[in-house]
Amino acid sequence: MSHLMNTYARLPVAFTHGQGAKVFDEAGRSYLDALAGIAVSTLGHAHPRLVKAIADQAGRILHTSNIYRIREQEQLGDRLAALSGMDEVFLCNSGCEANEAAIKLARMFGHQKGIDSPAIVVMEKAFHGRTLATLSATGNRKVQAGFEPLVSGFVRVPFDDLAAVENIAANNVVAVLLEPIQGEG
């Protein structure tokens, strides 16, 4: 028996390792990792340069708070800013955390502009994550069930319906949260 919380209905396979785009189960069978570890392992599994970089970093310092300067983070931030043309970057661990930050930044922007109840436009049937704010933004009742009351401030419109977006556009709309590549929803 596993003592892990049952957050998903697990499939009857256990992977032991991966190489490139393949993962291997306990019997040694290989599978194409078409999910890329749910978009976490987009560089593949066990790439020698990535393994070395992680091992080197773990051999120096594994983690410290971002209240301290971290040279490698600053170098990555500089490179991402140069490539994107942006002034600053926000590094995080997951898409859900990125969406939470986007929601908070949009609301903060709204409040700075004097908007008491900033609204964020989201798409029906979209998936944005499983934290309280992101599942509130998610347009799937099944994902939201049991977590009420949900976070307010989201306005839903159908995908690919510009007229619907224009109809709800109001002075309190501060952002559109849209994930153009949908893996769930």
Language-model features and meaning:
Residues 36, 161, 182:
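Short, glycine/acidic-enriched loop or turn micro-motifs at the edges of active sites
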Residues 77-175:
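PLP-dependent aspartate aminotransferase-fold enzymes
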